[in-house]
Amino acid sequence: LKEMRGLAIIFRFFMLLVLLLPVVALCPVKAETTSEGPILIVTSYNPETRSISDNLSAFMDEYRQRGGKYTPIIESMNCKNLSEAYLWKSRMASILGKYKGKNRPSLVILLGQEAWSAYISQDTEIAKKTPSICGMVSVNGLVLPDDSIDTRVWEPESKNIYTDFSDYNIVAGYVYEYDVDKNIKLMRRFYPDMRRVAFISDNTYGGLSMQALVKKEMKKYPDLETIWLDGRTETFMEVSERMRRLPQNTCVLLGTWRVDCTESYVIGNTTYMLRDANPTLPVFTIASVGLGHWALGGYTPEYHAVGKNIGAVTYDFLDKGDREGVDLLTIPGNYKILGHRGCFGVHVPDSLFLDSHILYYPYQPLET
């Protein structure tokens, strides 16, 4: 009888164990974390913006797959128009001020030109000493003003991420380079009689940042006159009219064109309208804008998502402690030339199409 009772107890215990196994299996296993400060990710725009969202998702996936233990926290600058640029510096200071003591970030990641500019405009210990990584930014940048400023007449100095911010703890990043020299040389190879460069930029941080860079670089070419078609002070129609009246021996270098002085976003086909304002003008691009339907070509960055790369380098730096294997990386650019002679009535010297050093960009008409 005692043996039967013992067997019954064992059987009941076994059945209880069998019943509990599915419950245990369904319980989530908590990922291993660290008590160190979080990874603070500051974005220029709302995280739901596609470019930001894609990079954030790629970062999260890569960092988690590698077994990262630090907790990412996302803050947004919610940057809008260039006219509010003077607010970005204080907005960044407010974000950084929320993370003190034990909550101080182990790493700050900046995604977007505006967030990066606001960060390098800080003169605080947390900004300068905390390790930082940047993405979706260019080599050239601007330091923001302290006070309200009329951005229509603001002429900031172009800064270089490699040479001007040695007092910041920039441990890694993926940056694009807008190479003015290579574009001017390319334009001269096509049009050796070029006497003027008309540069088009819009009423955005990116447009002003490019304009500041071009102003800095054009000092190397005193024999060339520079004409500024500036969306900060001109409407789309005013720029279009000036395009009609540009003098001979002028080549256009296209920066970016999304917002004019009315702070209204222009629709995509406005570049077609600018093209039609003076279809015989030779146009080159420094940022891929206009390729395929207007610009003959240019030396431009190879834009691509960097979230996965940042996730990998973050894991190496924080979790593996690999401080030697991470660094700033300039994403290589490329020459892109429209492989379609006689397009838009612009004469392209035949000899240039025999040059093996030029990479061709196939002509693909875009819908208007």
Residue map of PLM features:
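Bacterial N-terminal signal peptides that target proteins for export
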Residues: 1-15
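Short hydrophobic alpha-helices and adjacent helix-cap/hinge residues
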Residues: 3-6, 29-368
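Bacterial N-terminal signal peptides
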Residues: 13-25
